Amino acid sequence: RTPRQHVGGCLGHSFDHQRGYHPDPFYGGVMDVFRQPKYAYYMFKAQRSPEKQDRLFETGPMVYIAHEMTPFSPKDVTVYSNCDEVRLTYNKGGKTWTYTKPATKEGMPSPVITFKDIYDFMIDKNMSMRKKKQDEVFLLAEGIIDGKVVATHEVRPARRPEKVLLWVDNENTDLKADGSDFVTVV
């Protein structure tokens, strides 16, 4: 809970970058040096209103699982969402947990959601290697408002690489073919 004396806070720079005056890079941004969102980006995004707005930036309901599903990942699963409820499912036909946002408006508008003791890498390994059911191993978060699923996010463990997936990150802005434009390929 934030004390009554707290006036506000700020984030000095949103992107990781080379400082210029010091050899150590600045790693405190909500996006990395390639402008790819880090977990902090989604935590801040969850503080937005879930109402859709006609704006230049993303609006509306969101849910994001901040978990990598690796042998080194914690058992606790962290989820960021601005929805009233979040339902988390671990594996196909597996157990489901539900978080309901408290009615009181103290502190952050959308607190960080932690589902305790959910993930077990050995279950993942057993299903994938022994039972050959790697397609059934996942974490699925569903954001629910007024009893309806309005946002979803699914995370699957990384396997051996099969392909390279690239896309143009143009922020829905068309390129100009006069040679003066460039685009980031992610």
Predicted features along the sequence, with ranges:
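Short, solvent-exposed loop/linker segments at the N-terminal edge
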Residues: 67-73, 172-184
